[in-house]
């Protein structure tokens, strides 16, 4: 995989990412999704019978490739209060007015290859 594009999403408790399929782009190339901050519930499935539900923690990465690139997937829940302590207190003294801001946030970074 050659990283050519990235999307950064910011979520708060109560935010969701509805089930969807990535059909607006060529899906034969892998996608890497990295989670930071609060934990989230991630659901992925090709049909009603083959569904996986995972708890994504800060620092987890998901690789979607092959058949999974065409799967329905989404984030029905961000888990409030699950941000690791070291990140919940970030950024610290230099930007003290922002201290604790990440405590209720989840950052998702999606990296993908766009061209052959």
Model-derived regions, located:
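Catalytic core of Fe(II)/2-oxoglutarate
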Residues: 38, 43-116
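Conserved double-stranded beta-helix
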Residues: 1-41
């Amino acid at each position: 995989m050659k990283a050519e594009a990235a999307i950064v999403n910011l979520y708060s408790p109560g935010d969701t990412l509805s089930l969807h399929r990535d059909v607006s782009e060529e899906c034969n190339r892998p996608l890497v999704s990295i989670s930071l901050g609060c934990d989230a519930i991630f659901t992925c499935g090709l049909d009603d019978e083959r569904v996986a539900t995972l708890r994504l923690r800060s620092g987890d990465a998901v690789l979607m490739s092959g058949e999974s690139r065409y799967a329905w997937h989404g984030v029905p829940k961000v888990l409030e209060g699950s941000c690791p302590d070291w990140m919940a207190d970030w950024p610290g003294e230099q930007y003290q007015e922002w201290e604790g801001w990440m405590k209720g946030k989840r950052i998702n970074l999606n990296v993908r290859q766009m061209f052959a």
